[in-house]
Every structure is written in C-alpha cells, then in structure tokens.
C-alpha cells in the first residue's frame, strides 16, 4: 500500500510527541469544515437510495450532466483500470501516486511522462491520465488543451481521465461541463474543499454507459446514508462555498508569502497547499516534525507539500519554526 499524508498517529509514535500537540499540514484538506446539518434517523436506519437528491445536488454544483457518487474518488481510481483490456497508459507526472499504481496493478503498461512528452507519446496511448490542478505541483491545464488531447484519444477509442480533486477554487478550468463526451472521465473529491475528508465521498463524471459500467464494478450502496445527507447540504450551500473559496485562496497566498519570507520560495501550489522543491526538504521535514509540525515529504525530486494552517496560533507556530531553521547552531 502506498504512503499518503495525514499519518499523524505514526508521526506521533516516531517523534514521541502526543497526538494532540501536532500541527498537521501534511494533507491538502481545507482546515475549516463545512457546518454539519442534523442527520435524520432514517439516514441511519434505511438503505441509501439513489434518488434522494444527492446526484441532483452534485450535478448542479459541478455543472455536469451525470455523476456517480463514490466512496471517495479512490474507489474509481482502483476500479477504472479493470474496465479496459491491458493497454498503454500515460500518467502525467509527478502526480498522485495511486493512479499509476492502480493501472499497473490491473496489468496495463504504464509510462509516467512529463508535460513535454505528451505530444510525442499521445498517439501511442490508450489512456492518458492528468491530475488538474496537479498534486503536488499545482500546475493547471486549460480546458482547450485537455479537450484537444481527448479528441485525439477518443478517435481511437481511448480515454482521457482527469482527476480534478483540487479544482473547487478554479471551476473555470474544469471539464465537468464536457464530461458527457465519450471517452472523457472526470473525478471529483468532496472531502478536500469541504473539509470533510472522513466522509470518504467523491464523484465520477462521464457519459451514461461508462458510469453504468463503473457502477456495476462498484456494486450497490457505495455511499452511506448519513454522508449522502451531509453532502447534499454542503453541495447546495452557495454562501458557505463562496466564503470557503475566498478563505482558501487568501490563506494559500499567505502561506506562499510566509514561505518566501523565510527563504523557501514555493515551486508551485494550489488553493489548498504550497510546494517546496529544494535539496534541504528532507532536513526541513524532519526539523518541523521534531517540533510537532507534520508536512508531506516527496523524494523524486526532493520536495515538501504544506497544507494551510487553521488559525492564528498555527500560523505563528509555523512562522517561529521556519525562523529557527535558519539557525542550525540551535539544532
């Protein structure tokens, strides 16, 4: 199983720091969760029903013709590779590692390619996978470029799979409105923007036959009743959505400025995180962890991803820790 951010208990054991004393910046999850509605008893006592309004709320929010609710977009990441015969899959990298892993596990020939390699390789691929905005680089691809790639793939029966887990603050770059086109699949994550990662909810957007085939792969009742109720409330709450976007964008800019001020100019980022690429990243990760601040470390290349502090105390704590790193004699 691949390693992910958010492994706070493991860090607490490794660094011998109590769980409650940590500042977790290792995930790209909004630190301000949407308010939770009261959950009616029948959400617990009855089996979930697909016509309860969740799909309609998601279609309206994403601007999509059809959606399939998932137990997190991870469910589709693992199921989609089993819906095609073994073929050649290009994964625009670096990106969320589960994508390449899932296609390899299903027997496909996977090539992780850079942005400059898309054009020369595209006509030899059966599937191209793009994370947009990219995790961890923050790179955003414009719809016109992605749709041009899709058209070339679709002519040969290929797929363009776009993971838009971090798209909520930049909806103008989404392909959701085009997701009814054959061979185009869009994945959306609920937990990151809404700050409710524990709900384990995501959506696949695509044409009807493909979503029906994916539903057959996943089986019934993939999303439980309480989560369906909570998600409908959040997906329809335009005021909270607007406030969340403004807050996230402001916090991301503040984090970029804080890092830059301490001599760590970000190499990219999104509304939910900033990325550092520097040979000293491993040392910074360990230094911060020894002070109870958890970040997400990557090795190829040496880099760190930092999520957003939730409050002024957290901002001050990160500020002080970064200041201390400039003084190695104190270590």
UniProtKB/Swiss-Prot annotation:
Xref: CDD domains: AAT_like
Keyword Cytoplasm: yes
GO molecular function: pyridoxal phosphate binding; threonine-phosphate decarboxylase activity
EC number(s) from the headed UniProt entry: 4.1.1.81
Keywords: Cobalamin biosynthesis, Cytoplasm, Lyase, Pyridoxal phosphate
GO CC terms of this entry: cytoplasm
Cofactor(s) named in the record: pyridoxal 5'-phosphate
N6-(pyridoxal phosphate)lysine: residues carrying this PTM: 192
Example GO BP: cobalamin biosynthetic process
Top-tier EC class: lyase
InterPro entries: Aminotransferase_I/II_large, CobD, NHTrfase_class1_PyrdxlP-BS, PyrdxlP-dep_Trfase, PyrdxlP-dep_Trfase_major, PyrdxlP-dep_Trfase_small
One Pfam assignment: Aminotran_1_2
Primary role: Decarboxylates L-threonine-O-3-phosphate to yield (R)-1-amino-2-propanol O-2-phosphate, the precursor for the linkage between the nucleotide loop and the corrin ring in cobalamin.
Metabolic or biological pathway: Cofactor biosynthesis; adenosylcobalamin biosynthesis
Catalytic activity: O-phospho-L-threonine + H(+) = (R)-1-aminopropan-2-yl phosphate + CO2
Location of the protein in the cell: Cytoplasm
Subunit structure: Homodimer.
Family affiliation: Belongs to the class-I pyridoxal-phosphate-dependent aminotransferase family.
Highest rank taxon of the organism: Bacteria
Gene of this entry: cobC
SUPFAM superfamilies the record matches: PLP-dependent transferases
Protein name, as recorded: Threonine-phosphate decarboxylase
